Amino acid sequence: KITIGNSVLFGPHVFIITGNHQVNQIGKCIIDVEKKTERCDADVVIEDDVWIGAGTIILKGVRIGRGSVIGAGSIVTKDTQPYSINAGNPCRKIRMRFTDSEIEEHEKRLRP
């Protein structure tokens, strides 16, 4: 399942992948494996006020924190901290968008 919050901006060619294939079944080609285990799939959550740059790939089980920015071409394999700016392969935190006091003020203005 994919959950997308409010005021989320997507660049072109963003992929969100919530599943994977079971690759460790002895005696079967990957294409012939019919049964998936629970750990093959996991939800993706994109919280409010997020910007995801062009060509980003978001893998299963990831939560993109409120107010985060994901740089173009990133491969997101882990959760992001709210109000962080992230980029790369694998995606990692570059810096915060705001200071703690600025986050508090931003939240007050968005949700009076």
Cite the ranges covered by each PLM segment.
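Short, highly charged low-complexity linear segments
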Residues: G27-C29, G71-G73, H106-P112
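Short, basic/aromatic-enriched C-terminal tail that caps enzymatic domains
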Residues: I94-P112
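Flexible, glycine/small-residue-enriched loop-and-beta-strand segment within the central core
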Residues: K1-K60, N89, R95-F98
